[in-house]
């Protein structure tokens, strides 16, 4: 069954209209997504490798967890659901630190528009890689990397992390000390 999203206005407020995912992307409706960086006690960052069955960017390392906010969900509810669905992590509202929201309009292909309000969160947790029960249809592996390693690999063909997402993580590390 196709996912439905709340259509947002240009300011990120709900319009009261819901549309199926396919229509949201073909018509370019504004909608909300969540992006969660997971960081352990050693300040290592969890990355996921996208499954080789993914249509876009298969076998590529990316942010710890991300996904669309479903119709009727708040941003934090969407983040909690995505962490559970993708990584099997059970978290509560207070476990997530909201960082910021950015507005991005991206035309990735003919008749495919990604007009999103992207909400970023940090999850500090000491979950071990072997404890993560990831969604096999979405993810082929997860791994922790140091900040230095991430800086070294960020511009390689093995990683797809948008510059704005990387910048948010970099600001977090600069401001936390």
Identify what each model region corresponds to:
Residues 1-35, 39-42:
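Acidic, metal-coordinating catalytic segment for phosphate/diphosphate chemistry
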Residues 12, 86-90, 106-111, 130-131:
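Short helix-to-loop capping/linker segments positioned immediately adjacent to catalytic or ligand/cofactor-binding
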Residues 22, 59, 71, 98-105, ...:
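Nudix hydrolase/Nudix homology domain
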Residues 23-34, 44-81:
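Conserved Nudix-box catalytic region and its N-terminal flanking loop in Nudix hydrolases
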Residues 39-45, 53-55, 104, 126-128:
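Short, charged/polar surface micro-motifs in flexible loops or helix N-caps
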Residues 90-100:
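A short coil-to-beta-strand element that immediately follows conserved catalytic motifs
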